[in-house]
């Protein structure tokens, strides 16, 4: 598994994917600051936007581009014809994507702490960090989801599905259906944790996100093995 991760890191070393890990949270923060800079709830609004839209689309772009480049270059022939266990390879690709998303989330929270000080917001830094971590855990299922979807369709279709998922999350956010819509889990959790409301129901969102991520990872790996 370590060798697979090393190979994946080398593949993205000189690609735009490595740059996007740093660039996407910067773009997100700059754009949201430009829109909400005069709002007293600036930090909360930005955290909310990140939880249901920016993180989703950023994961789709990062994982999607990594899969897209390899699909376009070789159609995975060098992997499919190698003695490497395909199940382990796909799990390694997913873990690589998760590491990238974790780095991106760290960059985002650092930028958000800077925004908090610049605009003298009152949100507690500890709660901000907890909220970003919670949203990340509840959204990790998106990594195997996009890895599988881009591989069987294409990058644009996958991003389109992700965009529609986020839009639908907005309409469902104030209904009982939001608990059943995975694209809504990050936003629901952020709305609670940013206020320090760590109720049991919020932890169930994290658990569901992790379980769904494991299920989709296994599904994506077996799908790749049978390709």
Model-derived features with residue positions:
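Hydrophobic alpha-helical transmembrane segments of polytopic membrane proteins
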Residues: 126-153, 210-219
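Terminal transmembrane helical anchor/hairpin motif
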Residues: 38-41, 159, 163-227
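Hydrophobic core of alpha-helical transmembrane segments in multi-pass integral membrane proteins
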Residues: 23-33, 105-113, 206-220
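Helix-loop-helix units of permease transmembrane domains in multi-pass membrane transporters
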Residues: 66-98
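Membrane-interfacial helix-loop-helix connectors in multipass membrane proteins
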Residues: 111-132
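Long, hydrophobic alpha-helical segments
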Residues: 47-69
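Aromatic- and glycine-rich beta-strand/loop motifs that create alpha-glucan
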Residues: 1-22
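Selective transmembrane-helix segments that form parts of the transport pathway or gating/packing helices
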Residues: 16-17, 86-115
